[in-house]
């Protein structure tokens, strides 16, 4: 809108140049008419020149108003197209970001489920091993007890030693299973690694969505700037060219009117005949509207 307003002002300056030339022609024609008798050819000439000048000025004003409106409409259309581009980019970004976020969330949830399943499997395996070893130790103790009951107290010590060895071995195996589950690189660490990888993947996905949004915003701003600058500069250049043409045409009309008045003005009844340089400055003959294009 700022560029359209500037273009309208440039066109108005061209109208002002024509208006000044036409006003000067009207004033000169009226002055010549006042020096001549009423109803003479000079008076008619002055009135007709004034009417043509007024008509030409009105046409110029209408043309300038129409061109200013056209420039404003072009600028408004460019701005609306840029806004539509921005809206489409925002909608695309939202849809893309939503899909990316959902995919990242699914990957995180899958990693968590995998880690949970691995930990539960390790826990179940440790419990099963401990239960098996406990059953074996109980069976060995019962066997030893039966041996003692059958063979007497002389083998009690041997049975105790055997049972102690079996229990010690079972306890050692259970401790090894527990250490393997909690040691570096074990099941717990693997579950933690899966969880960390899932979180990193989600962070990368969100960062990519943010970068895409910034690129769309830059493209939208560039589209607005290009559309507005192109429409405004073209209209302003046309208005400035018309302004220069108006000034040149006004000067030519003044010289032509001065020459015609000095050469063709009729002699008044009292013998007065305007000489070159004494007639209206910038007046125009019939049929030549001042400033009309």
Swiss-Prot record:
Keywords: Mitochondrion, Repeat, Stress response, Transit peptide. Residues 27-43, 230-265 have a biased composition (Low complexity). Residues 279-293 have a biased composition (Gly residues). GO terms for cellular component: mitochondrion. Residues 27-52, 217-293 are annotated as: Disordered. Its main location: mitochondrion. Improves osmotic tolerance of human cells. Mitochondrial heat soluble protein acting as a molecular shield in water-deficient condition. Contiguous repeats of the 11-mer LEA motif is characteristic of group 3 LEA proteins and form an amphipathic helical structure under water-deficient conditions. This is Group 3 late-embryogenesis abundant protein, mitochondrial. The lineage of its organism: Eukaryota, Metazoa, Ecdysozoa, Tardigrada, Eutardigrada.
């Amino acid at each position: 809108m700022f560029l359209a307003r500037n273009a309208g002002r440039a066109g108005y300056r061209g109208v002002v140049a024509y208006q000044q030339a036409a006003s000067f022609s009207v004033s000169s024609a009226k002055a010549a008419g006042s020096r001549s008798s009423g109803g003479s050819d000079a008076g008619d000439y002055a009135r007709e020149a004034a009417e043509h000048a007024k008509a030409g000025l009105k046409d110029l004003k209408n043309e300038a108003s129409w061109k200013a409106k056209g420039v404003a409409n072009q600028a408004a259309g460019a701005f609306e197209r840029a806004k539509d581009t921005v809206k489409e980019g925002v909608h695309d970004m939202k849809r893309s970001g939503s899909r990316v976020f959902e995919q990242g969330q699914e990957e995180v949830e899958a990693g968590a489920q995998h880690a949970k399943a691995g930990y539960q499997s390790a826990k179940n395996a440790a419990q099963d091993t401990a239960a098996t070893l406990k059953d074996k130790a109980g069976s060995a103790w019962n066997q030893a007890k039966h041996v003692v009951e059958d063979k007497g107290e002389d083998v009690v010590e041997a049975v105790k030693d055997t049972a102690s060895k079996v229990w010690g071995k079972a306890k050692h195996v259970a401790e090894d299973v527990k250490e393997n589950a909690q040691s570096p690189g074990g099941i717990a660490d693997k579950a933690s690694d899966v969880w960390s990888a899932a979180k990193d993947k989600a962070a990368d996905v969100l960062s990519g969505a943010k970068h895409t949004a910034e690129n769309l915003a830059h493209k939208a701003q560039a589209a607005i700037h290009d559309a507005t600058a192109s429409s405004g500069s073209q209209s302003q250049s046309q208005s400035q060219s018309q302004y220069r043409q108006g000034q040149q045409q006004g000067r030519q009309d003044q010289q032509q009117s001065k020459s015609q008045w000095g050469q063709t003005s009729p002699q008044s009844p009292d013998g007065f005949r305007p000489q070159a340089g004494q007639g209206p400055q910038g007046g125009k003959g019939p049929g030549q509207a001042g400033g009309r294009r």
